[in-house]
Amino acid sequence: MKSLVKAKKEPGIWMQDIPVPEYGVNDVLIKIKRTAICGTDIHIYSWDEWAQATIPVPMTVGHEFYGEIVEVGKEVQGLKVGQRVSGEGHITCGFCRNCRAGKRHLCRNTLGVGVNRPGCFAEYLALPATNVIALPDNITEEQAAILDPFGNAAHCALAFDVVGEDVLITGAGPIGIMAAAIVRHIGARHVVITDVNDHRLELARQMGVSRAVNVKYQKLIDVANELGMLEGFDVGLEMSGNPMALNDMMKAMNHGGHVALLGIPPQETPIDWNQVIFKGLVIKGIYGREMFETWYKMIAMLQSGLNISPVITHNFPVDEYQHAFQIMASGQSGKVILNW
């Protein structure tokens, strides 16, 4: 089968012909129809320090997908051939304390599809049935291909009560933009998103934010004043991993505010702890998606009218994957889809 493989310990990804994966009694085999390129895939392509320490070579990469079931293991129940599916990309152990307590997103032994085990940038993917998400007919193929990052956005956006609250989002990448759409959909008052990339700020405007702010040219305090905000932001969603953005968020928060951290800053990032302590801020780290409550909520939001399609800006046949990766890495795109 056709597959995109991290075949060498150097920058690049290569298209290769490899065998169709075997599947076990508790697995399903999925015919891949569409995949989406993630920032993680860009790290793997560029072969940065994180990728060198993490990715086995050779290995098929990719973890965001839509497909149809073509084979079902003999012990699998509740799934059948022909079903439209996506899937949870974190494979958990099932035996650690958090897994046994129903908090599988906190499994200490998680393996990532396309990171620690073969991924979905291929014509077929074998996946444990427990990780497969059957989809209703009114979820489009393009939406289904980006449910994984949409789930990151939903997990972060739903971490705290945002109904009637003023929300600050730092980082207008695809996940930050989708988080903005979510909090607006569920009833936030003012939604402000910041970045230094005008292209992505314009995408955020299309998703209905109150203000999309290029912090190179405008100060948050001025935006808050324009919106009539007197006491700072109630909820912060940090998506950028940028140390300056993180500290700007802390300064902009109201006393008693809540901050969810999804972006990954450098390890030695300093924080002004006076902002945290004297304001009584609550900070929560966000990783992946809650299994599987986040999945139920994000599908329900799509069915109830939330439109995330504007964040999808490019579609390419898989044979043009090199150009697709260049577009994604340029920062001049939203989500980029590969059609199989």
From Swiss-Prot:
The pathway noted for it is:
Amino-acid degradation; L-threonine degradation via oxydo-reductase pathway; glycine from L-threonine: step 1/2
Q: Which GO terms describe its cellular component?
A: cytoplasm
- Residues binding Zn(2+) 1: C38, H63, E64
Where, by residue number, is the active site?
T40, H43
Question: Which molecular function GO terms apply here?
Answer: L-threonine 3-dehydrogenase activity; zinc ion binding
* Known cofactor(s): Zn(2+)
Instruction: Enumerate the residues binding Zn(2+) 2.
Output: C93, C96, C99, C107
Signal sequence interval, chain numbering:
none
Give the GO biological process terms: L-threonine catabolic process to glycine
Q: What class of enzyme is it?
A: oxidoreductase
Q: Which residues bind NAD(+)?
A: I175, D195, R200, L262, G263, I264, I286, Y287
HAMAP family assigned to the protein according to its UniProt record, in alphabetical order: Thr_dehydrog (MF_00627)
State what protein this is by name: L-threonine 3-dehydrogenase
What InterPro entries would the database entry show? Answer: ADH-like_C, ADH-like_N, ADH_Zn_CS, GroES-like_sf, L-Threonine_3-DHase, NAD(P)-bd_dom_sf, PKS_ER, Zn_alcohol_dh
Q: How does it assemble?
A: Homotetramer.
Q: In which family does this protein belong, per the annotation?
A: Belongs to the zinc-containing alcohol dehydrogenase family.
Which lineage is the organism of this entry classified under, starting from the top rank? Bacteria, Pseudomonadati, Pseudomonadota, Gammaproteobacteria, Legionellales
Location of this chain's protein in the cell: Cytoplasm
The UniProt note on the cofactor reads as follows: Binds 2 Zn(2+) ions per subunit.
What is the stated purpose of this protein? Catalyzes the NAD(+)-dependent oxidation of L-threonine to 2-amino-3-ketobutyrate.
- Reactions mediated catalytically: L-threonine + NAD(+) = (2S)-2-amino-3-oxobutanoate + NADH + H(+)
Chief location: cytoplasm
Q: Please state the Enzyme Commission number of this protein.
A: 1.1.1.103
Gene field: tdh
Q: Which UniProt keywords apply?
A: Cytoplasm, Metal-binding, NAD, Oxidoreductase, Zinc
Entry keyword annotation includes Chloroplast: no
In its UniProt entry, the species of origin is given as Legionella pneumophila (strain Paris)
Q: Which domain of life is it from?
A: Bacteria
